[in-house]
């Protein structure tokens, strides 16, 4: 049997870029998700979502998956840990990287993880989660801190916080060149707060 060699999981590096947004309501959450869904590099990326209970992580994921083309009811993976999805893409939105050559050009595989109740490191191996993270497609994880040390470096980290007006303050950090490409494309469609753009430019000048 051929063995699969996975990248060594190391500590999180310094961000390559960062930006922040304010979602005043769910409509703006949906608009942000639609802008993110248009980034081709997202189709083979790993995204972490951080935030307290009720911050809106699962709501955002539902908007993102619908924007990517997932149809039907989108269940939360809280009890199952992971929910797989398939999105049908038009040929112009086919995954751009050679590593996705084995996938149908019109099907995007998506795995939505929720590690809130995860407490057994052995399950990570036995359930095949490591293989899923090494597979082509989009991986999204809520409560990644519950599986810290077992997960790869995230391309994007989105921290969602409830603000005083019941909107959402969102900070996005990128930790890989792929994540930076996604962020740069996202900023063209969904301008960030002015102070975060300055922080982003400062972070990406090196």
Task: Describe the function of each predicted region.
Residues 94-107, 202:
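Intrinsic disorder/low-complexity segments
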Residues 57:
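Conserved lysine of the Walker
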